[in-house]
């Protein structure tokens, strides 16, 4: 294990926090300051990839901050097409990031062995990479280093996007960044131009590889907007370079030296080699991605809607066989003969499997309010980021019924047209967001308490303060004023310094009350073993008279946790709820509910049926679910009212309405989701 500048490794590496011992194996790769080794758990013999960064390499603050940013972003991502961070720890010599191991190598390895891939194979990989990018961009994360060597493959060739060393999380969708970073062959033109303009504004010259000719070309050829920073569209340019590389075996702007490469990027100087015959749809797809103006460049949604990825026009396999390592994938004859016939075959297969509308579904839902029968939309195949330590198992999944539908729908939506005439492959799969399952209104005395579907309990007290109890009831976040929303964190135990004794007892009471009245209470047996480990670490630090750093011990849990920011209860029983994430929920008087999230709308009927649709459906004239449209329109009107209100306007009605004789009112979701929601 002797490698130049490689980190010093002992025969056994111990993670004291999780009490796991690893045995280092072979070197898998390296880049920058980090080295990636194969690690074996000596107890279970499970294999992982471990990214190791020597502490000596992070002595400068900017390098350490960059490392912290990478870990913070990456460990919060949970998606089937993103390489998962399983653990992070350190010893006296190194920092260790334990990752799921991708035994299929990288996309670069596959291209080198094959020289180039077929369009069918490229479609398979592109769909999965786009799913990952949709997820990242939905979280306001720019990867900034999309390239073939950062696309890791499992043994079955499933895709895992990795290496978030250059990633950045934006506060708003409009936020722009100026840092020139990435891999030269995959660098978008606006990254180059923005770097030049920022250096010019500070009186400094550009990067040595950007010569005077390149600077002049930027001013002559690129729109002024491109010099103002880069955003999510930078990932789409890099993705275009990646697609080109899959088909032709090399990046589109590759040259003998970096200076020439940069000038070719600025000129958008690339061509499609005639030696490989490709479809016009592919050429149009790549051109739409390699567009110099980032405002006109294809978005993830436009890519997924493009004819090159249309499963009714082109066959897109659900999996690839092992032999593609050495030979092209052959499209099955029945699939290549006729796209129309291919789609009809898929629909017939779905119907034969029990679906009434050409989908694999568990059962046909009952009519809602006597309106119409509604087929279930494609249920999610991936999960939202959750903290790894502080979430109960029962707070980690959607309903059994919804899960069953999800498992049946995985991989079956390609080319399937639902009741509304909408090809479900046109829209990304989603799952229900977290929502408030049950609540109790004691604002005539104490405040408003609620239980979220992730298992946490929250209270908005009458003095405008707020507390959120983590799903495992170990950690509490508290803010003395919702107007400021500045939260402190502590252990949830008697004598805690951030909560008064009265509020501690009230939060304990509301927790017991809400969990006991839930349809499916969270069983104590489902608390994860990490809870006990967290307790053990805290007790050990107390014995050693160490100051307990809750931010360190609970860094997988956002501060603050998801909490209710505003609420309003109307006389007719309609309850409006606004989260700090801007997710908005309306509980209607007939016990149906609507949850409006950033990219989805969830409808819960009074009969406990749950449907989650992409928000884009509401813009599609073919989507004829009139009842949902009507309720979403009502929800939007409520939203405009509540967003302008103070956090505790609802409480004020009890303070100043002396004629009110209302006692406490309470409500519970008519649900079949149990305590879950990932």
From Swiss-Prot:
Binding site for ATP: 28-36, 51
Phenotype seen when the gene is deleted: Morpholino knockdown results in increased number of cells with more than four nuclei, increased number of cells with condensed nuclei, time-dependent cell cycle arrest at G2/M or G1/S phase, and increased length of membrane-bound portions of the caudal, anterior and ventral flagella. Simultaneous morpholino knockdown of both PLK and Kin-13 in interphase cells results in increased length of the caudal and anterior flagella, and to a lesser extent ventral flagella, and reduced volume of the median body.
POLO box domain segment(s): 435-516, 563-644
Keywords of this entry: ATP-binding, Cell cycle, Cell division, Cell projection, Cilium, Cytoplasm, Cytoskeleton, Flagellum, Kinase, Membrane, Nucleotide-binding, Phosphoprotein, Repeat, Serine/threonine-protein kinase, Transferase
Processing after translation: Autophosphorylated. Autophosphorylation is critical for its function in cell growth, cytokinesis and formation of flagella.
Gene Ontology cellular-component annotations: axoneme; ciliary basal body; ciliary tip; left anterior basal body; left anterior flagellum; left caudal basal body; left caudal flagellum; left posteriolateral basal body
Gene3D superfamilies from the UniProt entry: Phosphorylase Kinase, domain 1 (3.30.200.20), POLO box domain (3.30.1120.30), Transferase(Phosphotransferase) domain 1 (1.10.510.10)
SUPFAM superfamilies on file: Polo-box domain, Protein kinase-like (PK-like)
SMART domains per UniProt: S_TKc
Main localisation: other
InterPro entries assigned: Kinase-like_dom_sf (IPR011009), POLO_box_1 (IPR033701), POLO_box_2 (IPR033695), POLO_box_dom (IPR000959), POLO_box_dom_sf (IPR036947), Prot_kinase_dom (IPR000719), Protein_kinase_ATP_BS (IPR017441), Ser/Thr_kinase_AS (IPR008271)
Biological process, per Gene Ontology: mitotic cell cycle; mitotic cytokinetic process; mitotic nuclear division; negative regulation of motile cilium assembly; positive regulation of cell cycle checkpoint; regulation of microtubule depolymerization
Single GO MF annotation: ATP binding
Consequence the record notes for mutating residue 51 to R: Loss of autophosphorylation. Reduced growth, increased number of cells with four or more nuclei, increased number of cells with condensed nuclei, and increased length of the caudal, anterior and ventral flagella
EC identifiers of the protein: 2.7.11.21
Region described as Disordered: 658-678
Catalytic activity: L-seryl-[protein] + ATP = O-phospho-L-seryl-[protein] + ADP + H(+); L-threonyl-[protein] + ATP = O-phospho-L-threonyl-[protein] + ADP + H(+)
Modified residues (Phosphothreonine): 179, 183
Activity regulation statement: Inhibited by GW843286X (GW), an ATP-competitive inhibitor. Inhibition leads to reduced growth, increased number of cells with more than four nuclei, increased number of cells with condensed nuclei, cell cycle arrest at G2/M or G1/S phase depending on the treatment time with GW, and increased length of membrane-bound portions of the caudal and anterior flagella.
Protein kinase domain span: 22-309
UniProt biased composition (Polar residues): 663-678
Active site: 145
Subunit note: Interacts with Kin-13.
Family membership noted in the UniProt record: Belongs to the protein kinase superfamily. Ser/Thr protein kinase family. CDC5/Polo subfamily.
Functional description taken from the UniProt entry: Involved in cell cycle. Involved in cell division. Involved in cytokinesis. Involved in flagella biogenesis and in regulation of flagella length in interphase. Involved in formation of median bodies during interphase. Phosphorylates Kin-13 in vitro. Likely regulates microtubule (MT) depolymerizing activity of Kin-13.
Name of the molecule in the record: Serine/threonine-protein kinase PLK
